[in-house]
Amino acid sequence: MGHSHSTGKEINDNELFTCEDPVFDQPVASPKSEISSKLAEEIERSKSPLILEVSPRTPDSVQMFRPTFDTFRPPNSDSSTFRGSQSREDLVACSSMNSVNNVHDMNTVSSSSSSSAPLFVALYDFHGVGEEQLSLRKGDQVRILGYNKNNEWCEARLYSTRKNDASNQRRLGEIGWVPSNFIAPYNSLDKYTWYHGKISRSDSEAILGSGITGSFLVRESETSIGQYTISVRHDGRVFHYRINVDNTEKMFITQEVKFRTLGELVHHHSVHADGLICLLMYPASKKDKGRGLFSLSPNAPDEWELDRSEIIMHNKLGGGQYGDVYEGYWKRHDCTIAVKALKEDAMPLHEFLAEAAIMKDLHHKNLVRLLGVCTHEAPFYIITEFMCNGNLLEYLRRTDKSLLPPIILVQMASQIASGMSYLEARHFIHRDLAARNCLVSEHNIVKIADFGLARFMKEDTYTAHAGAKFPIKWTAPEGLAFNTFSSKSDVWAFGVLLWEIATYGMAPYPGVELSNVYGLLENGFRMDGPQGCPPSVYRLMLQCWNWSPSDRPRFRDIHFNLENLISSNSLNDEVQKQLKKNNDKKLESDKRRSNVRERSDSKSRHSSHHDRDRDRESLHSRNSNPEIPNRSFIRTDDSVSFFNPSTTSKVTSFRAQGPPFPPPPQQNTKPKLLKSVLNSNARHASEEFERNEQDDVVPLAEKNVRKAVTRLGGTMPKGQRIDAYLDSMRRVDSWKESTDADNEGAGSSSLSRTVSNDSLDTLPLPDSMNSSTYVKMHPASGENVFLRQIRSKLKKRSETPELDHIDSDTADETTKSEKSPFGSLNKSSIKYPIKNAPEFSENHSRVSPVPVPPSRNASVSVRPDSKAEDSSDETTKDVGMWGPKHAVTRKIEIVKNDSYPNVEGELKAKIRNLRHVPKEESNTSSQEDLPLDATDNTNDSIIVIPRDEKAKVRQLVTQKVSPLQHHRPFSLQCPNNSTSSAISHSEHADSSETSSLSGVYEERMKPELPRKRSNGDTKVVPVTWIINGEKEPNGMARTKSLRDITSKFEQLGTASTIESKIEEAVPYREHALEKKGTSKRFSMLEGSNELKHVVPPRKNRNQDESGSIDEEPVSKDMIVSLLKVIQKEFVNLFNLASSEITDEKLQQFVIMADNVQKLHSTCSVYAEQISPHSKFRFKELLSQLEIYNRQIKFSHNPRAKPVDDKLKMAFQDCFDQIMRLVDR
């Protein structure tokens, strides 16, 4: 309970168990004239065997005769049942006369006596705290064994549950305490939704004021004691009808029709008006007036109850949705206390007291201590000890930093870990651990408070129910995705709390919207270490943020590590050393940035031609060894030294101005190479390029003009901006022509045009390379070779994996043809030291920049204020989101490694193991300008090593999440080990405009994707790209949903047909294993170019998804037509002789049952489109229909009992009511 924190919770799970009114089989009759005799009969009947026989355990032969849903008319009534009851309080009091008042003197109920114990029904959901209390759902039936001394609690045995699933069946027979006012006798009218008991005429009109025509309720008459009144709303007015009783104890409104029970009367008038102004259609929901007061514990009811006259309220400390927190004075003990007051009608009392019920069992020096409660009258209080410094969040923000050195911060964190370790050992979860919910007392003593969301775990995990809400930025991924919580979920929240403490109260994930947090976490991003944070503390944060709960430490281990850190006495020295490094790097980086700014300003005085050059400069504005200022929350060298001990580079992470984004964890640090290496090497090329002032520059794409101007900080003059734009537009046509003329479509490709916001590709170059190699001009075009390489890489990535290795002109430029420098492939171009690539990635993981999250196309927000950011970030925004890209290992170690033949042989061996790794996806917005051209077939291998890296690293992030994997939808799971890198990409990419745009050209491009076999020169194309996922033009694979794959399989036909065609096209296969894999797994199929007709036409993705399930919306006409079909089948079925069991009859039974099931599912969808009142009745009818359908379906068994005529009538009656409701 935070003094300055909101006392209200996001939501309380106790409200999530909302369910429909229970189904009861027993009717209710009117009261006798004498109250005493009526109560005596009621108690006797509640113990009678007749009532005890009617339960969910009742045989179908008894339950099958219900003609309609039981909310209005419980069947199976007889003359012995009574019509009504007095108030529930009288019933409880009378029922308790035979019980033992003192709990200590209560007798043990034997099996024989428990069978005669009174049967009660739960009116509301009750969630017991601890093992002594019995949790109930609304509608559950219990037998009362006894009461405590003040009758506030009763000990009950669970007799039956509303749901007869396996988990509930195991609970039958459990014994525990429940509040007396949460249950009512089985024959009580309180179980009906429409019965409101003793309410006034004006109250009934107020309740029906929010209803519609047909809304009604039944109440006790104010003027005629012992009789009832129906209040019904029609055309904006409320009409009241008294229910009369004749000499034979029958109830009626008009003399024409009379009834023995109130339930029968209400049901009749729900079908026929018969004197009422309209039908009784929509029962008005009643307030939970019965959920009144009860003591905190059944065994010690007065232990925590305090006299509110002893408490003097002082100033208000904080407030929230559900109540306020005050500073108070306790006169008896002469001490200051904190009082948490519940606002009237803000939340149910039992939910408010659940927090106190948990706190009373917790006693630890680092947990806020409960002193008592005041629950006898409103407002209700929870009283705890007073913490003078308020909550931890505000304390960190307002306190002078000099008073909170690092050693004090770590001590605070250690105290919190100690308290959480105590909760962990006692199987409690907090679920709302944050700085705002921790309180600070004198001498920096910290205690955990606010247990409103805390729960006791009977198993290893606790699952919150649908609709529960929690603080997103503090909740673990399994809690956000599946509402599953454990102590390891609190460990995740502790990592965020530790980050709050280290930043003196800053909000986590700065600049990230709540809707984007889960996407960042799922794709490996984590927050950077705070500035000056010691590596050991940041390491602990990252351990708490492991994706798999099993990989996170326990609180006792966290507490042990923090205590060791405190005792080491080296914490302050580490912090000072870290800050000194950061300051030195910042000074050096500022100096370099100022030089770049001066060059940029000097260029602004040149012509529009030079403006375009300067726009290119924004893509390559760093020198070979940049030192970027280490701003807040930037991962520094020491921050990640425990991840990569072999790191020797001194380059820090790149960050633009504005709030940073979380970096990936240690398994996912490789993507950061893309920007750091590009920034470090492209600067030399950019500077040389400026001095050469070549005329053949890339034109400004129309859609990137504003981005380019914004990136330069608005320094481009307006006139020059317009001239540059117009000049670029004039050059677009000629530039396109030169692009199309190039054999590979990459000779004149534009980086600014080819790479969109969602591009995942760049060309990282190692620092050790001589930058002069990349600034020489190509003899054919006179253009900068380095720029041509980048364009070529980005261009050819969209065509085929074979083109990944074509840009070796820097190593052996003479091998390129004069006509098309990048057009042909040859064996000399395969010069990649594969085995050194991982080492390079590992050695550069610390110097790489933090990946910038992609735009909203990938469901991650992008900083709007990145003016000083290099344009190279535009080309790498998705880096790190989907795992390391294969650009990491491309052309990295060309100069370092000279053993090309060995590398080539090693590469071929590697290819044979990795040739089925799926392509990756790069959403490029300008794919429409990229033609597909023929490629040389002389090469025997395919460069797919980067795919292996991507799949491997992505698997590291998610392969240990076994508790969560089965919850994931198909589109988020890996189809096999080699395709784990495609996890969750389709979910983000579905909303991407860029992805949708590039998908238009997939049909044209996919059949032309060449792929070479490692064991021959036969040129084949994959015919099952629809299985691995739709291949984007850039060469990546998108994971498909299950219904997409199913529809594609249907179009493909059987596996044997496809395999036979492939065998005809490729008659000679060298490896039997491949042939076996071809027939076994569709994802491994390969065919020749002649098999293009096997590939089905690509549908529009939106149509494909929506059309597969919701081809047409559920309409009233659809339901009516289905009803007519079932009606006809029903008539035909029962026209057959009942004794005749033929195959025809059996088949008709199954067909009709299936159609009824189809009707049930269709109506369930239709029910969501109608008014809430109609939905209530609709669902009741559907539930009844399902029961009848089940009974009829199994009645076709020759050994089964033949269908009774009453069941037929009941089914027909229920069926007719559904038809009337649909028509109405």
Curated annotation (Swiss-Prot):
SS bond list: none
Major location (coarse): membrane
Enzyme Commission (EC) number: 2.7.10.2
Basic and acidic residues bias locations: 579-620, 797-819, 864-877, 1001-1016
Signal peptide extent: none
Motif stretch (Kinase activation loop): 450-474
This protein's UniProt keywords: ATP-binding, Cell membrane, Cytoplasm, Kinase, Membrane, Nucleotide-binding, SH2 domain, SH3 domain, Transferase, Tyrosine-protein kinase
Domain SH2 positions: 194-284
Reactions accelerated catalytically: L-tyrosyl-[protein] + ATP = O-phospho-L-tyrosyl-[protein] + ADP + H(+)
Ranges where the record places region Disordered: 579-671, 736-775, 796-881, 914-937, 968-1016
Keyword NAD set for record: no
Annotated GO biological process: defense response to fungus; defense response to Gram-negative bacterium; DNA damage checkpoint signaling; negative regulation of apoptotic process; negative regulation of cell migration; negative regulation of DNA damage response, signal transduction by p53 class mediator; negative regulation of engulfment of apoptotic cell; response to ionizing radiation
Active site: D432
Binding positions (ATP): 317-325, 340, 385-391
Compositionally biased spans, kind Polar residues: 639-655, 746-760, 973-984
GO molecular function: ATP binding; non-membrane spanning protein tyrosine kinase activity; protein tyrosine kinase activity
Domain SH3 residue range list: 115-188
Pfam families named among the record's database cross-references: F_actin_bind (PF08919), PK_Tyr_Ser-Thr (PF07714), SH2 (PF00017), SH3_1 (PF00018)
Any Gene Ontology CC annotation: plasma membrane
Highest taxon of source: Eukaryota
Domain Protein kinase: 311-562
PANTHER family: TYROSINE-PROTEIN KINASE
Family: Belongs to the protein kinase superfamily. Tyr protein kinase family. ABL subfamily.
Stated role: Functions downstream of migratory protein mig-13 and is involved in Q neuroblast migration during larval development. Recruited by mig-13 to the leading edge of Q neuroblasts and their descendents to signal downstream, likely to the wve-1 pathway, and direct migration along the anteroposterior body axis. Promotes germline cell apoptosis in response to oxidative, osmotic and heat shock stresses.
Subunit field text: Interacts (via SH2 and SH3 domains) with mig-13; the interaction is direct. May interact with soem-1.
Protein name: Tyrosine-protein kinase abl-1
Gene that encodes the chain: abl-1
